[in-house]
Regions:
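Sec-dependent N-terminal signal peptides
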Residues: 3-12
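Exported/periplasmic ABC-transporter solute-binding proteins
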Residues: 16-41, 49, 54-233
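Generic cytosolic/nucleocytoplasmic N-terminal low-complexity/intrinsically disordered segments
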Residues: 1-2, 178
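Hydrophobic anchor at the start of a short beta-strand
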Residues: 46
Length: 233
């Protein structure tokens, strides 16, 4: 699955050619893609690359990426030469179960056999899941049950297929796939650090007209409506 993600990033670069390349965490593919499509209709040459933020930052170091949409806290810990941030909204950690399997509270996770989570080192919501497990006092009980996967899209795939009993994802995917899950439980925000999603401007953005248009676009009412629709407010 990781190999497929890397291939998708490479394909975006090849396909993009001289186009502006914007990277984003895989859990934000849907809203960022909608924003990109609106810009394309306006004549802006722009493409997106999507994977967990760890993989995106590796790609960004090659200098081909102009901006990254992701967790500010995560990006600030990287050694990328970030020139500034444009705040988009706030995300949330959500627990979901497959259709047909219902739970009412996170305490019931102790009764489940397998729970998927994004990579704790490379993915935004893997970091937040780890924080939640520690702060809730559930870490010791749930550690043997946890199945780490690349990122939010992979957790969603495991949950929907019924290969796991539950999974931790972001509010964006929870909203986008409404009706495809059994239970949808928003985790108490006091149990993990805030998730502020921003567009980080990289050196390739400076003096780039297309990048300036992208940054301006995410501030427009139509883009704010898109992000709000996918749970970013």
């Amino acid at each position: 699955m990781k190999k497929l993600l890397l291939i998708s990033i490479a394909a975006a670069v090849v396909f993009g050619g001289e186009n502006l390349l914007v990277g984003a965490g895989g859990g934000y593919k849907k809203p960022v893609t909608e924003v990109i499509e609106n810009l394309k209709k306006d004549g802006v040459q722009i493409e997106g690359a999507f994977a967990n933020l760890g993989q995106i930052t590796i790609q960004a170091k090659e200098g081909k990426m102009a901006a990254i949409v992701g967790d500010e806290a995560f990006l600030k810990k990287t050694d990328l030469d970030i020139k500034g941030y444009e705040r988009i909204g706030k995300g949330a950690l959500v627990l979901v179960t497959p259709k047909g399997k219902q739970i009412k509270d996170v305490s019931e996770l102790k009764n489940l056999a397998k729970i998927a989570m994004p990579d704790a080192k490379k993915a935004i919501y893997g970091v937040r899941t780890t924080e939640f497990l520690k702060n809730s006092g559930l870490e010791a009980d749930l550690a043997p049950k946890m199945l780490p996967v690349a990122g939010v899209p992979q957790v969603v795939a495991y949950v929907i297929s019924g290969e796991v009993d539950a999974g931790f994802i972001n509010s964006t995917e929870a909203v986008a796939r409404e009706g495809e899950f059994g239970s949808v439980i928003y985790i108490d925000e006091a149990l993990y650090s805030p998730v502020f999603i921003s567009a980080a401007k990289l050196p390739a953005c400076e003096g780039n007209e297309a990048c300036a248009k992208f940054i301006d676009e995410i501030k427009t009412p139509r883009s704010k409506e898109i992000f709000a629709k996918f749970g970013l407010k």
